[in-house]
């Protein structure tokens, strides 16, 4: 039946886990639906200084981009973002990703 709906709505590969169209909803660390995201490019040896300058970013850490070890991604939900929403790009309905594919997030709005 999954193929019927994906064919009906012209979503090729939505039921195939190896397809980029097979996406899982992104969740915040608290388990809520992530609606904010951003990324920062910082060389590994400067990462500690980055967290000294922006210690609040640790709570939003999501991971590093595969193939780009100096690009760090950060996500948050409506409840966890607090007063830092101006740093992130907002997706009111959230978004989905297939963990088998690399995704680039928008650059963080840090001073």
UniProtKB/Swiss-Prot annotation:
<keyword id="KW-0449">Lipoprotein</keyword>
<keyword id="KW-0519">Myristate</keyword>
<feature type="lipid moiety-binding region" description="N-myristoyl glycine; by host">
    <location>
        <position position="2"/>
    </location>
</feature>
<protein>
    <recommendedName>
        <fullName>Uncharacterized protein L672</fullName>
    </recommendedName>
</protein>
């Amino acid at each position: 039946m999954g193929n019927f709906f994906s064919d009906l709505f012209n979503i090729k590969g939505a039921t195939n886990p190896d397809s980029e169209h097979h996406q899982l909803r992104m969740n915040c660390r608290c388990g809520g639906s992530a609606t904010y995201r951003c990324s920062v490019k910082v060389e590994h040896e400067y990462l500690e200084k980055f967290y000294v300058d922006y210690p609040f970013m640790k709570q939003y850490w999501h991971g590093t981009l595969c193939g780009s070890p100096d690009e760090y991604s950060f996500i948050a939900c409506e409840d966890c973002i607090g007063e830092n929403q101006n740093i992130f790009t907002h997706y009111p309905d959230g978004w989905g990703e297939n963990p088998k594919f690399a995704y680039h997030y928008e650059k963080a709005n840090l001073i």
